[in-house]
């Protein structure tokens, strides 16, 4: 929440920013970073894939947890990176991009971005593992 005081004759009031707004912003920003294949662990991605197919949309907050105060936010990200990237460099770029984007959009100071790299996406693998739609059914 930010306190918007009267300055130069403007109207004062309070602005509150919901956790979901920060989580969505962080999730979308994280997916923009080169080397980040996806967010969330195997279980959350599998559950999310089923939910996304039913709802016909993707959840930008999957793999993102936030704590939002009046002026600050802390962000935790569960990340899947592409095979071959330098994880430390990707994490640094991810941390900076997410913090900068959340601050620019919300005005909140991002005090920390914690990153857990849970998996590596191998070349040729896809989000739909186990869902080989291109292969014919084995049993008819």
Where are these regions (language model features)?
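Terminal low-complexity, intrinsically disordered regions
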Residues: 1-32, 37, 41-42, 50, ...
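Short, hydrophobic beta-strand segments
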Residues: 7-9, 75-81
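Short edge beta-strands and adjacent turn/loop segments
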Residues: 43-46, 50-78, 120-122
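Soluble periplasmic/extracytoplasmic beta-strand elements of cell-envelope proteins
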Residues: 16, 25, 65-67, 74-78, ...
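Beta-strand elements of well-folded, non-transmembrane domains
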Residues: 70, 81-83, 102
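Short, non-transmembrane amphipathic alpha-helical segments
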Residues: 87-110
């Amino acid at each position: 929440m930010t306190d918007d005081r009267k300055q130069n004759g403007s109207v004062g009031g309070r602005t509150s920013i919901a956790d979901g707004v920060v989580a969505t912003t962080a999730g979308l920003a994280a997916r923009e970073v080169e080397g980040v294949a996806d967010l969330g662990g195997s279980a959350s991605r599998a559950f999310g894939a089923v939910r996304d197919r039913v709802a016909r949309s993707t959840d930008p907050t999957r793999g993102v947890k936030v704590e939002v105060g009046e002026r600050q936010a802390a962000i935790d990200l569960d990340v899947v990176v592409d095979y071959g990237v330098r994880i430390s460099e990707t994490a640094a770029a991810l941390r900076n991009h997410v913090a900068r984007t959340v601050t620019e959009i919300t005005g909140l100071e991002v005090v920390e971005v914690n990153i857990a790299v849970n998996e590596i996406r191998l070349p040729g693998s896809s989000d739909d593992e186990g869902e080989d739609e291109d292969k014919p059914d084995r049993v008819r």
